[in-house]
Amino acid sequence: MAAAMVAAVHGVGRQDRSSPGGGGAPQVDTGKYVRYTPEQVEALERVYGECPKPSSLRRQQLIRECPILSNIEPKQIKVWFQNRRCREKQRKEASRLQTVNRKLTAMNKLLMEENDRLQKQVSRLVYENGYMRQQLHNPSVATTDTSCESVVTSGQHHQQQNPAATRPQRDANNPAGLLAIAEETLAEFLSKATGTAVDWVQMVGMKPGPDSIGIIAVSHNCSGVAARACGLVSLEPTKVAEILKDRPSWYRDCRCVDVLHVIPTGNGGTIELIYMQTYAPTTLAAPRDFWILRYTSGLEDGSLVICERSLTQSTGGPSGPNTPNFVRAEVLPSGYLIRPCEGGGSMIHIVDHVDLDAWSVPEVLRPLYESPKILAQKMTIAALRHIRQIAHESSGEMPYGGGRQPAVLRTFSQRLSRGFNDAVNGFPDDGWSLMSSDGAEDVTIAFNSSPNKLVGSHVNSSQLFSAIGGGILCAKASMLLQNVPPALLVRFLREHRSEWADPGVDAYSAAALRASPYAVPGLRAGGFMGSQVILPLAHTLEHEEFLEVIRLEGHSLCHDEVVLSRDMYLLQLCSGVDENAAGACAQLVFAPIDESFADDAPLLPSGFRVIPLDGKTDAPSATRTLDLASTLEVGSGGTTRASSDTSSTCNTRSVLTIAFQFSYENHLRESVAAMARQYVRTVVASVQRVAMAIAPSRLGGQIETKNPPGSPEAHTLARWIGRSYRFHTGADLLRTDSQSMDSSLKAMWQHSDSIMCCSLKAAPVFTFANQAGLDMLETTLIALQDISLEKILDDDGRKALCTEFPKIMQQGFAYLPGGVCVSSMGRPVSYEQAVAWKVLSDDDTPHCLAFMFVNWSFV
């Protein structure tokens, strides 16, 4: 009876109650409730595990197959499953709420600690301010001061003095001396992570919360550059430490980490002597290397600490390896403080503080090495994001892409990024050698006759390099860009591959993966390239990076190009396309793959990398889509806001690095080199044209440079469009309470239907579109002017327009039947109806034609 009472908990429902029956079967009475025995509950639970929501036929089958359920009505079985699903949902919701509550509790603790740290910083700044006031009010002290310290020296300045100046001499070439350095490093790191040793300024846009990445801050007025992060993850401290120590897995600029010595300490910690190499981000600077002491230890409160610093002449200690062509940089006391959270998970404090020897690079590139925001994006935020990604994958809630586990897809991303870095840097110890130049130094050509050493033993490279001998050739170049947001440029290159890519070169790269021989192509304009289809594979938790497969549909032009008629596939990695991420590097890397897409497939990555050279202002930048006052206005009609936005963006600079890799057979090396050199020059020219088109699009006062003579300002055009529509049709197009020109422009821009204008010429081209129109055409305001009306309409649409065109010119408007058009990416778009009308200027002369596609959607 006791067992039956326990089992009743599983059976209580809206319509069943237990009654104490014997014989193991429930006794259904005239009431509404039934009591289930343990055997019956076990049978029901077994079916629930297989199918939580069985159909009526399945429930009847269950009663027939289980004699112990034969005396229960099918309706009661249905109620049991309903209640069971309800209890499961409640359990999951309760668990989720408990998790959120733990996160909020931990975040509250983190914010309180951050508030205490900021209070200390405020107190110190108040003290220093008073000290400065005292010095300014006592000029006589300044004139009579003969000490070596300046009168403006503050407490902060004293803190930033090199501690080596007061450190007593010691022998750091033994374990005791190294432990002393390690303990000093630990103390200095903790003072940065939780104290006020560095003035931290929070990065814009990084808001704390239960689902946010955490609190991100960068240094202000300190030696070197530093970044700091605090966040919560649902992994235990030991697992977090293991991930952070595996730096190449999350720091994309890390080439190698060699642990040369491991020394256990008496307190249970370890000291490691590490040599690390990092890639150069561009072809215009040398890579960096580091000689580091890393100290891992536990604190009394149960926290785990991993701290590190460079061993230099001032710190003492053994000398590290010296590698030619690398510039020795310095890690100042940095590390990770990992604290366990109540209920599971960890609270992480990350500090990265480095001196990258910026004076050794050309002056124009120094911002790459002097920007704490770039350091934060590349190292600090990258580490925290990687840990959060692993935690999310470990939870089992992340769907697999293409049938592959997240770890496999992550390996593909790492291989693409690493292969591109290898191509940009071209290290001699990987087998790279420079080819003689043709006299112009704009494109560098390097070749690698030992590709198996570069590709790696774990990759099947037999299909990539023929038995008669061959290798890899890389053509690369770097250039400076002005006024081009990196994210916007990379996004355009991704979405409009046909604007810069040569289909013959793509086919050559794809043919290298096949057994058939191939010839070196001649460059051609346009070519056979069909549509581009993007197949998503995976993305990171915050969508700052995504992996995808690109299918290029090929259409051969003649019989001798049969090899080109096959579809081609690219594995592509895109990152940094968020325009609001300060200091973020935007990158587009791709490699040809075959249809099998094996895990060990060889990859020859090529692509683009754009890095900002100037830090962004703290004010959020205007987006291209809806800062109408700055994006769409023209000439002197720009508002004050447009002027201020222009001043904040008109001087931005970035460095673009391009690298393309090709496999070659030995007897074709010179031909491939000539093709690669010319191809990269062609790509550079294409990117420059795109950059020139994109650059003014964000500068409100300069947008007149792309408009034809006589073009009206955007708000005037919006007024003409709305007024002409009302004049011809008698209906209002723009519903706005205000009569101001700005409100009309905003209403048209936000209109749900696609509205676009085209010129009154023999071959009409689009001159303007609202946001819905740009979305439908899958283009931008700049690229819009390269799209003709005839290009987007199908045969039926063109016939309908030709039939109604005289009516449009005579009566001013016409309704066109619904149909299908195509976007600039080749995707079909259906619409219920189209309206065409003549747009009249203030003097009633025809200015352009306007079209509105009603209720459009992608097919």
From Swiss-Prot:
Expressed in seedlings, roots, stems, leaf sheaths and blades and panicles. Keywords: Coiled coil, DNA-binding, Homeobox, Nucleus, Transcription, Transcription regulation. Residues 100-129 form a coiled coil. Its main location: nucleus. It is found in: Nucleus. GO terms for cellular component: nucleus. Residues 146-164 have a biased composition (Polar residues). SMART domains: HOX, START. Residues 29-92 bind DNA. Residues 7-31, 146-172 are annotated as: Disordered. One of its GO terms (molecular function) is DNA binding. Residues 171-393 form the START domain. Probable transcription factor. Belongs to the HD-ZIP homeobox family. Class III subfamily. This is Homeobox-leucine zipper protein HOX32.
